[in-house]
Amino acid sequence: MKRTYQPSRRKRVRKFGFRARMATRGGRAILRRRRAKGRRKLTVSDEKKPY
């Protein structure tokens, strides 16, 4: 049986990236909460590229 996590950069960014968050009201709420909390990384788009 294969594992449930099959990583894909493109899928990850499209689902959890900054533009995806900004596209919906709920997503903007997430960003607002993370900013209020002082997160250095708001979305997966803010990650340092490992290559």
Curated annotation (Swiss-Prot):
**Can you tell me where the transmembrane regions are?**
none
Gene Ontology terms describing biological process: translation
Picking any one GO molecular function of the record gives: structural constituent of ribosome
Keywords of the record, alphabetical order, are: Ribonucleoprotein, Ribosomal protein
Matching entries from Pfam families are given as: Ribosomal_L34
One CC-aspect GO term: ribonucleoprotein complex
Is Lipid metabolism given among the entry's keywords? no
UniProt superkingdom: Bacteria
Family to which the UniProt record says this protein belongs: Belongs to the bacterial ribosomal protein bL34 family.
Q: Which HAMAP family match?
A: Ribosomal_bL34
Q: Which NCBIfam families match?
A: rpmH_bact
Q: What is this protein called?
A: Large ribosomal subunit protein bL34
